[in-house]
C-alpha cells in the first residue's frame, strides 16, 4: 500500500510511525511525498494560502481520489471539518500532548517576559490568545519547519516561540518549555492527533482500522462537532478541547472563539455525559454560535481576506 504524506520532517515522522505500526500487523507499505500548497508558500502567512483552509490536506485528497495513493497521514487539526466523500478517516491514533508550549532561549515563562517581548507563531488563534493574556507583548509571524523555528529563536529573532507540544514529541525531542494551560490557551480542535485517511476500499480500510484509538476518536469528534458551524477551519482564532474524566463517565469540554486582536471572546467550559455526548456537543456548538461565536469567526475571516488583498495592515501576524 502506498502512503502519501507531506515532505516536512514532522509529516515524515508521523508517516513513518504509521508505516511501522502497519508493518507490525503484516502490512507492507511505501511512502510517496506530495508537495502541498501549505509547503510551497512558506513566504506568506498560512491564512493567506488558499484561504488557509486545507492548505496541508487538499492535494493529498486529490491524489488519493485519483488512485495514486492508498493512505494519507495528516495532523488532524489541519483537516477541514467538511471532508470529501469517498475518503473515510479510518483511524485516529492515540493522542499526544494536545497543548501549546512556549519556548524561550533562557527558560523565561510567559508571565516573566518583559513588556514588548516578541513572540513568534504561525497561528492566529495563539496570536489572539497571547494578545488577550499579555496585550503588552508583540506577536510576529513565524513559518517554517520545527528546526527553522528553533534556529530563529536561538538567533534571537524572537524572545519566545509558540508551538504544539505534540510536534516536539513526534520528533523525539525533549525540549524544556512552559506548557500553556487550556484554561487560557484552549488548543486547536484535534491538536496532538494524527488521522489516517484511506480510499473507500474494504481491504485497505480493514488493514488500517486496527490502528484506531477509541478514546481519541471520541474526543476529536466532539471537538470537531463543537466548531463545525463556525467556519474558518484551523486558520481562525478558534479553540476546542475535549477530554474524558478519569471514570470515563463524562467529557470535559472547553471551546472558544476570539477576535483577532484578542479583545473579545466567547467561551464554553462544561462537563457533558459520555452517553449522548455527540448530541450534547451539537447543542453546545449551537450555543457557541448564539453567544456570538459565528459572528467573531466571520469577522476574523473578513479581516483576513482584507489583509490578504493588501487593503488593511492593522494586524502583525
UniProtKB/Swiss-Prot annotation:
Pathway the protein acts in: Porphyrin-containing compound metabolism; protoporphyrin-IX biosynthesis; coproporphyrinogen-III from 5-aminolevulinate: step 2/4
An annotated GO cellular component: cytoplasm
GO molecular function, one term: hydroxymethylbilane synthase activity
Classification via InterPro entries: HemC (IPR000860), Porphobilin_deaminase_cofac_BS (IPR022419), Porphobilin_deaminase_N (IPR022417), Porphobilinogen_deaminase_C (IPR022418), Porphobilinogen_deaminase_C_sf (IPR036803)
Residue spans crossing the bilayer: none
Keywords for this protein: Porphyrin biosynthesis, Transferase
EC number(s) reported in the record: 2.5.1.61
Cofactor comment text: Binds 1 dipyrromethane group covalently.
Family: Belongs to the HMBS family.
Entry function: Tetrapolymerization of the monopyrrole PBG into the hydroxymethylbilane pre-uroporphyrinogen in several discrete steps.
Name of this protein: Probable porphobilinogen deaminase
Upper classification of the organism: Archaea, Methanobacteriati, Methanobacteriota, Stenosarchaea group, Methanomicrobia
